[in-house]
UniProtKB/Swiss-Prot annotation:
PANTHER family, alphabetized: E3 UBIQUITIN-PROTEIN LIGASE BAH1, E3 UBIQUITIN-PROTEIN LIGASE NLA
Keywords of this entry: Metal-binding, Transferase, Ubl conjugation pathway, Zinc, Zinc-finger
Protein name: Probable E3 ubiquitin-protein ligase BAH1-like 1
Pathway: Protein modification; protein ubiquitination
Transmembrane intervals: none
Reactions it catalyzes: S-ubiquitinyl-[E2 ubiquitin-conjugating enzyme]-L-cysteine + [acceptor protein]-L-lysine = [E2 ubiquitin-conjugating enzyme]-L-cysteine + N(6)-ubiquitinyl-[acceptor protein]-L-lysine
Domain SPX: residue ranges: 1-149
EC number(s) on file: 2.3.2.27
Family: Belongs to the RING-type zinc finger family.
Entry note about domains: The RING-type zinc finger domain mediates binding to an E2 ubiquitin-conjugating enzyme.
């Protein structure tokens, strides 16, 4: 079965109607564009690239795909956030959320919803990449790849959503087994693995895409601790991200300047809306308890030192010293 049919069958089989990529409609647009290109060839026009004023490329295909992916990512982020809030809530708040949330009251329902959301995210990411690949093939261009890069900067690349990593960790936390902490399966093809003490969440789906999320901080080169995901999708330790943003742990990342850039992709303005990955933090703490305990002790000392330096500087500034 071709991917387009698999995708259509999957979207129709969902319990509720969610935004998706209109593969059939986009393919029709590309088919029309292919006919236009062939007519240009027959007329003797240059055929090595997409025409400069192609109505399909400039006015229909990319704007349509942009709107659809924005809707998919927005829906995914919203649902993932609600599900994770329900799981992480405590006390009276948790009781209230469980009481008011329909269909989420059983442990099994939470597991299934987490699995469904991860699948929804990845299959839509596959759909976008396949239609962009088809676009480039028809037009002999790299505009599809350029659009994919632009999607990352616009935060509509769903595989870079911090909520995807959190959902995977959430699912593994619910299914955690004390007998096998080395490689905890997600749903057959997804797991947390350690290669030379370097943790990675890996996921295969539909035999066409592999998602690997490195859990090594690129600043301290160690396993991420108290991890945060920036708006661009890159994951760092909280202390490392504060250092990169030139802010104190007291002020936090929300106080970072808009011109501060991600150390990896150099995208600006990605610190203020950083997401704390609490589920991932829990998963790693259970997976490597000895390392985690040592790191907690080190972090506690470092945070006390940084907080002390901050308040001492504030006192000196207040006293005019």
């Amino acid at each position: 079965m071709k991917f387009a049919k698999k995708y259509e069958k999957y979207m129709k089989g969902m319990d509720e109607e969610l935004p998706g990529v209109g593969l059939k409609r986009l393919k029709k647009l590309l088919k029309k564009c292919r006919s236009d290109l062939q007519s240009h060839e027959n007329d003797g026009s240059s055929a090595g690239r997409c025409p400069g004023h192609c109505s399909v490329c400039d006015g229909s295909f990319f704007p349509s795909l942009l709107n659809e992916m924005s809707a998919v990512v927005g829906c995914f982020n919203e649902k993932a956030k609600k599900l994770l809030e329900l799981h992480l809530a405590s006390g009276f708040k948790k009781y209230t959320m469980w009481f008011t949330s329909k269909g989420h009251k059983s442990h099994g329902a939470l597991i299934q919803q987490g699995k469904d959301l991860v699948t929804y995210a990845i299959i839509n990411a596959v759909a976008m990449r396949k239609i962009l690949k088809k676009y480039d093939k028809i037009h002999y261009s790299k505009q599809g790849q350029e659009f994919k890069a632009q999607a990352q900067s616009l935060h509509i690349e769903i595989l870079q959503s911090p909520w995807l990593c959190e959902l995977m960790a959430f699912y593994m936390n619910l299914r955690r087994s004390k007998k096998n902490n080395g490689a905890m399966e997600l749903f057959g093809d997804c797991s947390l693995v350690f290669d030379d003490d370097k943790p990675t969440i890996s996921c295969n789906l539909f035999d066409s895409m592999r998602v690997d999320i490195s859990l090594t901080c690129s600043i301290c080169l160690d396993t991420v601790f108290d991890p945060v995901a920036l708006s661009c999708g890159h994951i760092y330790c909280y202390l490392c991200s504060c250092s990169a943003a030139s802010v104190t742990i007291v002020d936090g990342l929300k106080s970072a300047e808009r011109k501060s850039k991600c150390p990896l992709c150099r995208q600006a303005g990605v610190f203020p809306n950083a997401v704390h990955l609490d589920e991932l933090n829990m998963l790693l703490s259970y997976s490597c308890p000895e390392y985690w305990e040592k790191r907690i002790q080190m972090e506690r000392v470092e945070r006390v030192r940084l907080a002390k330096e901050h308040w001492e500087s504030q006192c000196r500034a207040f006293l005019g010293m």
